[in-house]
Swiss-Prot record:
A GO CC term assigned to this protein in UniProt: cytosol
The entry's keywords: Amino-acid biosynthesis, Cytoplasm, One-carbon metabolism, Pyridoxal phosphate, Transferase
UniProt site (Plays an important role in substrate specificity): H225
PANTHER family: SERINE HYDROXYMETHYLTRANSFERASE, SERINE HYDROXYMETHYLTRANSFERASE 1
Protein name listed in UniProt: Serine hydroxymethyltransferase
InterPro entries in the cross-refs: PyrdxlP-dep_Trfase, PyrdxlP-dep_Trfase_major, PyrdxlP-dep_Trfase_small, Ser_HO-MeTrfase, Ser_HO-MeTrfase-like, Ser_HO-MeTrfase_PLP_BS, SHMT-like_dom
Length: 412
């Protein structure tokens, strides 16, 4: 960082302040995590200088012999992690990975079955403001109003009624185990292909703590950050029969040169995920989420679906204490807890207001937080939200946050 400080003090100061924010706050945004210093070093390496259009052994530029090595390592490690027949590590993001699959599997205007955004889906699963909802005809499935679990009978009914060409499983705010086998059975029944977006749960899948969609899906997409704890980026895993179409759709279809410094960082992260301690970490992520959920319930909050099976806890703050998700997010930010407002199933509030917040445990677990720490986190959340207009109580909450972050420093 000394070079940035000398060359561009304004940018240096902003980076330092962001580090201070990350170190002093408890990060509960479910899609965020902290990469290792090895991953960060790879991403900041000289590979950022190299252009390498094409794929290992088939490049349109010279001098690619070393980036061929790092990209090939990333591919082979991803195959080992997930048991995939083919892997493309070049997508710059999860959204671009999803776009590539749609371009391979669909024609403009084709019918797709995807999860309702407010029920836990993702923008790229058919939201009308997103390219997916503009280019394709998405039919939405959701959760049962009583138990807030995916209603597989509804999924089957909608699939039979609408005859989609593709069914999309996976979510960005669903806290329960997804039955990919059931989705595959429904897809086969109506002659549809199955795509699974496992961006949020990829780390849990890699550790064997969530069913692996690769066994069932034609296409699996993911980000490489979140629970996988790698650099920000995307990846596609598919059956060998789709290899050629997927690869040519990524390049030259929707991308030019791959980000080889990011791909090297992906390789390092995948190597870390192959180690035994990665499973221990993912086990702790789940234990922490369950401790967080249970303590919030004991504090009087309604947790969507009554609990969690993964890294994520969705909380109905509107139904619990008559507070919007927006105000809850702002209040928690004041005391040093970072989360995001989020719609919950059957939400009546606007998307920028919401009735809920989404909480996740991966980042704080990386810092070393255990169940007892997350019991304390839940109690701090309760203290802050129930006293959002009481400065004395908010200061107490802030001090308790500081005690935790001091105990578990980031990049010690």
């Amino acid at each position: 960082m000394s070079y940035i400080e000398k060359k561009d003090k304004v940018v240096y100061d902003a980076i330092q302040k962001e580090f201070q924010r990350q170190n002093s706050n408890i990060e509960l945004i479910a899609s965020e995590n902290f990469v290792s210093q090895a991953v960060m070093e790879a991403q900041g390496s000289v590979l950022t200088n190299k252009y390498a259009e094409g794929y290992p052994g088939r490049r349109y530029y010279g001098g690619c012999e070393h980036v061929d090595v790092t990209e090939s390592i990333a591919i082979e490690r991803a195959k080992a992690l997930f048991g995939a027949e083919h892997v493309n590590v070049q997508p710059h993001s999860g959204s671009q990975a999803n776009m590539a699959v749609y371009l391979v599997a669909l024609e403009m205007g084709d019918t797709v079955l995807g999860m309702n955004l407010s029920h836990g889906g993702h923008l790229t699963h058919g939201a009308t403001v997103n390219f997916s909802g503009k280019f394709y005809h998405f039919v939405e499935y959701g959760v049962d109003q009583e138990n807030e679990l995916i209603n597989y009978d509804e999924v089957r009914r909608l699939a039979i009624e609408h005859q989609p060409k593709l069914i999309v499983a996976g979510a960005s705010a669903y806290s329960r185990t997804i039955d990919f086998k059931k989705f595959k059975e429904i897809a086969d029944e109506v002659g549809a292909k199955l795509m699974v977006d496992m961006a949020h749960i990829a780390g849990l899948v890699a550790a064997g703590l969530h069913p692996n969609p690769v066994e069932y899906a034609d296409f699996v997409t993911t980000t490489t950050h979140k629970t996988l704890r790698g650099p920000r980026g995307g990846m596609i895993l598919c059956k060998e029969e789709y290899k050629k179409d997927i690869d040519k759709t990524i390049f030259p279809g929707i991308q030019g040169g791959p980000l080889e410094h990011v791909i090297a960082a992906k390789a390092v992260a995948f190597g870390e995920a192959l180690n035994d301690d990665f499973k221990d970490y993912q086990n702790q992520v789940i234990k922490n989420a369950q401790a967080l959920a249970q303590t919030l319930i004991e504090e009087g909050f309604r947790v969507v679906s009554g609990g969690t099976d993964n890294h994520l806890v969705a909380v109905d703050v509107k139904g619990s204490i008559n507070m919007t998700g927006k105000l809850a997010e702002e209040t928690l930010d004041k005391v040093g807890i970072t989360c995001n407002k989020n719609t919950i199933p059957f939400d009546k509030e606007k998307p920028f207001v919401t009735s809920g917040v989404r909480l996740g445990t991966p980042a704080a677990t990386t810092r070393g937080f255990d169940e007892s720490a997350f019991v304390e986190v839940a109690k701090i959340i309760s203290l802050a939200l129930n006293n959002y207009d009481n400065d004395t109580k908010l200061n107490e909450a802030k001090e308790r946050v500081h005690a935790l972050t001091s105990k578990y420093p980031l990049y010690n």
